[in-house]
Regions:
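Long, low-complexity, intrinsically disordered regions
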Residues: 1-140, 171-197, 261-325
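Alpha-helix N-cap/helix-initiation sites
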Residues: 132-139, 153-157, 228, 232, ...
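Amphipathic alpha-helical interface segments within eukaryotic helical scaffold
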Residues: 147-150, 154-250
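HEAT-repeat alpha-solenoid elements in large eukaryotic scaffold proteins
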Residues: 212-221, 239, 259-276
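Charged, surface-exposed interaction regions in soluble eukaryotic proteins
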Residues: 248, 253-257, 278-281
Length: 325
């Protein structure tokens, strides 16, 4: 048979039937007739059903009407609830508006969003019906709110440092919050305690999260130094304090992870603040404390100290390259 020509298939098939024994042909013809009758019966049933359906469609469908009515009632009952945003002025609205503006800040939209933030701060300071104490409490709450956002975002650290630097020029509370934070920043590094994920996975995740926050804050501080919001000597003192903690930890057992994390922060200071430190190489604290500590750590070998990893040693070698360029 030629499968590529369906009509040839048809002719060949019936030629084949002609060659079948005559006793078989009547049986086939009989089956054809039965199929024909069956199809006619099926067609008649469909026709009768269509007529009945057409007839019944002329009658009012009370059940369908009732169902539609019930559905409309359900739709009315479960209409989506629309929550309207409150336009009432107050600290909650100002903080919400400020968060929105901070989230929208980009290099191109900086001025517009900065002005929106300043407008919210102005409303806070000029709000009527509250005393001076409450007004100061409100602005302090908002300032802390802004600081927490700005100091914990690694990707926008430079942009947020610019924002915070400008705010310190308009409201002294921002500088006060910054100085309070810096006074406790070094001691916060002592809170780094490694957690084994096999023992406490949730605790380990929090440990990683806190380390990321510390790194973001390190960048934020460095950019504030570049903007001269924080004096260079303040950052140099922070670096020395971190180095002292590292020197203590490498002599203790099971401090490898803590030393690694502190080293990462030190590297961020030196890498992002490279231009700053180029200008202060004559400073006594840099020349006789910071630089010798870096050189000493870079020359150690694994096993020289109880809690000194190859990772940390290599990172100090990278620091040598950074400050030597």
């Amino acid at each position: 048979m030629n499968s590529g020509h369906p009509y040839l298939f048809h002719d060949e098939f019936y030629s084949f039937l002609n060659s079948i024994d005559e006793k078989v042909i009547p049986i086939i013809n009989h089956d054809k007739q039965d199929n024909h009758n069956t199809n006619n019966n099926h067609y008649n049933r469909k026709t009768d059903y269509a007529k009945r359906n057409q007839s019944s469609s002329k009658k009012p469908n009370h059940a369908a009407a009732t169902a539609n009515q019930n559905w409309e009632e359900v739709r009315t009952m479960f209409k989506p609830t629309t929550i309207e945003k409150s336009n009432e002025e107050g600290i909650d609205k100002w903080m919400q508006d400020i968060r929105t503006s901070i989230n929208k800040i980009t290099s191109k939209k900086y001025e517009v969003q900065f002005q929106n933030i300043m407008n919210s701060l102005k409303k806070c300071m000029e709000m009527e019906g509250i005393d001076e104490s409450q007004r100061n409490a409100n602005i302090k709450l908002i300032a802390n709110f802004i600081f927490n956002i700005a100091s914990t975002n690694k990707f926008y650290a430079e942009l947020y440092a610019n924002l915070y630097g400008e705010l310190t020029q308009s409201y002294s509370i921002f500088q006060e919050i910054l100085q309070t934070f810096l006074s406790t920043y070094v001691s916060s590094v002592k809170e780094i305690h490694y957690i084994d994920p096999d023992v406490n996975y949730e605790g380990y995740c929090n440990y990683i999260k806190q380390n990321d926050v510390r790194k973001a804050t390190a960048l934020f501080i460095t950019y504030l130094v570049k903007r001269k919001v924080i004096p260079v000597i303040r950052l140099l003192n922070i670096i020395v304090a971190f180095q002292d903690i590292s020197k203590q930890y490498i002599e203790e057992e099971n401090r490898v992870n803590e030393v690694d994390e502190i080293t990462e922060i030190l590297f961020l200071f030196l890498h992002e603040g490279k231009t700053i430190f180029q200008d202060c190489k004559g400073e006594w604290i840099w020349k006789f404390v910071i630089l010798p500590n870096i050189e000493t750590m870079s020359k150690y070998k694994k096993g020289d100290k109880k809690s000194l990893s190859t990772r940390t040693i290599f990172k100090y070698m990278d620091m040598i390259s950074e400050i030597g360029d």
